């Protein structure tokens, strides 16, 4: 039976450290300031944004929400980002995805000052991550949260075979880069990968981010592996579940993250920690 990695408790510990750092900055007369830009009225995005605001307020981070209509032009959004880039007391900028179809998300990401890119998606920051130059570099929050989990649970990465299933820019690619930087041998798999089970069964560390409920079954996992489930799916009964068949896989692994209370809580805590880091790096 695998040990459960408790993301909720770990996230609370990180929040506590972040609060201390916020207080230190405030003692120097500096208030960390996160600006979230929300375009349109996507209900899921509104929930995410509300959660970020609530967490920021709880930790003493100033948080501003900029709402824009779904029919604004791409240029109007780019001008708003430019204005935030030039606003001295704004330390961190986050544009909530997805954006309306007529707006190019890559252009928007490119427009954010890399020094204020709290999501770690700007090509400059992604390039630094792949070069292994991560000092003073914002990194995608979910993969960064997973690395914190490895550290906290003393999970050794060096020399291990790691398989990441899912190649998004938000999780898969930065996760692969972080594992590579930590001296793992990394395979990045995706929906076109042939004989996926042959790869996953070899993995000492398996990170799954496909968005497909119970995508990974017990016969696809190596005995004693570390399994990280990034999925947030709904099963046929509407119950929140992950990309891994937790109940059956848990019996075979050394460590596993549950859904909920696994990777999810870490992401928002890392976002707050990164807001504080961007503030410190700007002083």
Swiss-Prot record:
<protein>
    <recommendedName>
        <fullName>Bifunctional protein FolD</fullName>
        <ecNumber>1.5.1.5</ecNumber>
        <ecNumber>3.5.4.9</ecNumber>
    </recommendedName>
</protein>
<dbReference type="GO" id="GO:0009086">
    <property type="term" value="P:methionine biosynthetic process"/>
</dbReference>
<keyword id="KW-0378">Hydrolase</keyword>
<keyword id="KW-0028">Amino-acid biosynthesis</keyword>
<keyword id="KW-0368">Histidine biosynthesis</keyword>
<comment type="similarity">
    <text>Belongs to the tetrahydrofolate dehydrogenase/cyclohydrolase family.</text>
</comment>
<feature type="binding site">
    <location>
        <position position="191"/>
    </location>
    <ligand>
        <name>NADP(+)</name>
    </ligand>
</feature>
<keyword id="KW-0658">Purine biosynthesis</keyword>
<dbReference type="GO" id="GO:0035999">
    <property type="term" value="P:tetrahydrofolate interconversion"/>
</dbReference>
<dbReference type="GO" id="GO:0000105">
    <property type="term" value="P:L-histidine biosynthetic process"/>
</dbReference>
<dbReference type="InterPro" id="IPR036291">
    <property type="entry name" value="NAD(P)-bd_dom_sf"/>
</dbReference>
<keyword id="KW-0554">One-carbon metabolism</keyword>
<keyword id="KW-0511">Multifunctional enzyme</keyword>
<dbReference type="GO" id="GO:0004488">
    <property type="term" value="F:methylenetetrahydrofolate dehydrogenase (NADP+) activity"/>
</dbReference>
<dbReference type="GO" id="GO:0006164">
    <property type="term" value="P:purine nucleotide biosynthetic process"/>
</dbReference>
<keyword id="KW-0521">NADP</keyword>
<keyword id="KW-0486">Methionine biosynthesis</keyword>
<dbReference type="InterPro" id="IPR020867">
    <property type="entry name" value="THF_DH/CycHdrlase_CS"/>
</dbReference>
<dbReference type="InterPro" id="IPR000672">
    <property type="entry name" value="THF_DH/CycHdrlase"/>
</dbReference>
<dbReference type="InterPro" id="IPR046346">
    <property type="entry name" value="Aminoacid_DH-like_N_sf"/>
</dbReference>
<comment type="subunit">
    <text>Homodimer.</text>
</comment>
<dbReference type="Pfam" id="PF02882">
    <property type="entry name" value="THF_DHG_CYH_C"/>
</dbReference>
<feature type="binding site">
    <location>
        <begin position="166"/>
        <end position="168"/>
    </location>
    <ligand>
        <name>NADP(+)</name>
    </ligand>
</feature>
<dbReference type="GO" id="GO:0004477">
    <property type="term" value="F:methenyltetrahydrofolate cyclohydrolase activity"/>
</dbReference>
<keyword id="KW-0560">Oxidoreductase</keyword>
<dbReference type="InterPro" id="IPR020631">
    <property type="entry name" value="THF_DH/CycHdrlase_NAD-bd_dom"/>
</dbReference>
<dbReference type="Pfam" id="PF00763">
    <property type="entry name" value="THF_DHG_CYH"/>
</dbReference>
<dbReference type="GO" id="GO:0005829">
    <property type="term" value="C:cytosol"/>
</dbReference>
<comment type="pathway">
    <text>One-carbon metabolism; tetrahydrofolate interconversion.</text>
</comment>
<comment type="function">
    <text>Catalyzes the oxidation of 5,10-methylenetetrahydrofolate to 5,10-methenyltetrahydrofolate and then the hydrolysis of 5,10-methenyltetrahydrofolate to 10-formyltetrahydrofolate.</text>
</comment>
<dbReference type="InterPro" id="IPR020630">
    <property type="entry name" value="THF_DH/CycHdrlase_cat_dom"/>
</dbReference>
